[in-house]
Amino acid sequence: MATTDLRSLLDPASLAIADQAIAEVGTDRRTLPVAFPSLPRRVGRERCGTTRVHIDGADVDLAGFRTCDVAAAVVLRATAATDAECLDLWSHGDLDERVMLLRSLHFLPVGPLTVQLFGEVQRTNVVSHLEAAVGDGDLFARTAGRFGFDQAAANRLLLKVAFLDVPLARLFHAERTANAELSRMLQDLATEREAAGRPVWRDTWRLIGRAPCPGSLARLLGGIEHGDDGVRLAAAEGLLAAGRTEFAALAAERLPRESRPAIRALLQQLSARR
């Protein structure tokens, strides 16, 4: 993975605009609520790239970040914006300005502000805000267990991720936070959705395999017979993560009836654990 500098992601014109905003705020901090919202209009909303990079301790996928998001982070970092100033931007910002602030969090030091804004996002159903806060980077994983973002808080946010159907793969390393209580919560949500005839978050099977609770293994076994290819793949990955050997025969029985190469490969690994 490439390592790069945050400022290098901006072209000269955008960087000049960011530096102008930094100078203005440095002269009069009261200009921050004016300079910050103007960034999308002044530097644009184009995507910053298509690669996954490492920037100052953060692991991010540039495909999820816009030029204005990076410019905002440059300004907030250079001006040492306080938590109070950032919360004021949140309180008075529109939907897009809040996205920009949440994207900036990926490049700011993890701290109480991160946790407070995670809480704001968790209490809403705004998909773009959830994606901006925890998607396309490792911010969730870097925050877990710090500054009051304990297991219970992390579980609630991951449950919101499941509720809004954001793919787990967009939260880099979030699978490491799997725990039995989260599995119980995800299974309860899955049961509710199934009863209502609604689709279940596919990553449910991946996470419950890492930290099974009562009912997890039955759900995983049912998953490898599911009609949805994505569910079967996730269930096979979950069974592998569970590390159990007693399901080798069941995997071997399923193998001849599985047509998808990626799922077959996982079933072969499972069946070899006899």
Predicted features and spans:
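N-terminal alpha-helical scaffold/docking segments in eukaryotic complex subunits
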Residues: 1-79, 146-274
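Contiguous, well-ordered alpha-helical segments that form the cores/surfaces of helical PPI scaffolds
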Residues: 72-77, 87-88, 99-109
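Alpha-solenoid HEAT/Armadillo-like helical repeat scaffolds in large eukaryotic proteins
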Residues: 85-93, 104, 116-125, 129-133, ...
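Glycine- and acidic-residue-rich phosphate-binding/metal-coordinating active-site segment common to enzymes
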Residues: 108-166
